[in-house]
Amino acid sequence: MKVLLWIGYVLSFGLLYLYLVKRAKRAALQLNNKLVESHTIPFAVRDFIAACGGRTNFVSLRTSPTQLIVSFAKPELVQIAALQKLGIKGINKSQNQYRFVLGNFVNQLKQQIENER
């Protein structure tokens, strides 16, 4: 009797295991063609502009997928500490140009800065 019970356990759990493996493989092979892009900016755009020295300090704006590349008329007006308080992930300076590592909402930020100018 115990032997039949053990055979029943092995068969039932074996079939359950095979079913779960097949289901996991099917889920792993599904293609994900959706690109997730955030449309919410986690800080006030006016605070960002103020920390960059005001609207008139912006010369040009460009974006990469996660970075905002800005050329300033007077780079000495940029307040690094104020920008870091806004939660900017990285700030790289090269001559009059700054690269702000922000995230995938950089296109929305660029549009709002251009609308404010």
From Swiss-Prot:
<dbReference type="GO" id="GO:0009401">
    <property type="term" value="P:phosphoenolpyruvate-dependent sugar phosphotransferase system"/>
</dbReference>
<keyword id="KW-0598">Phosphotransferase system</keyword>
<dbReference type="GO" id="GO:0016020">
    <property type="term" value="C:membrane"/>
</dbReference>
<keyword id="KW-0808">Transferase</keyword>
<feature type="transmembrane region" description="Helical">
    <location>
        <begin position="1"/>
        <end position="21"/>
    </location>
</feature>
<keyword id="KW-0472">Membrane</keyword>
<feature type="domain" description="PTS EIIB type-1">
    <location>
        <begin position="42"/>
        <end position="117"/>
    </location>
</feature>
<dbReference type="GO" id="GO:0008982">
    <property type="term" value="F:protein-N(PI)-phosphohistidine-sugar phosphotransferase activity"/>
</dbReference>
<comment type="function">
    <text>The phosphoenolpyruvate-dependent sugar phosphotransferase system (PTS), a major carbohydrate active -transport system, catalyzes the phosphorylation of incoming sugar substrates concomitant with their translocation across the cell membrane.</text>
</comment>
<dbReference type="InterPro" id="IPR036878">
    <property type="entry name" value="Glu_permease_IIB"/>
</dbReference>
<dbReference type="InterPro" id="IPR001996">
    <property type="entry name" value="PTS_IIB_1"/>
</dbReference>
<protein>
    <recommendedName>
        <fullName>Putative phosphotransferase enzyme IIB component MPN_268</fullName>
        <ecNumber>2.7.1.-</ecNumber>
    </recommendedName>
</protein>
<keyword id="KW-1133">Transmembrane helix</keyword>
<keyword id="KW-0812">Transmembrane</keyword>
<keyword id="KW-0597">Phosphoprotein</keyword>
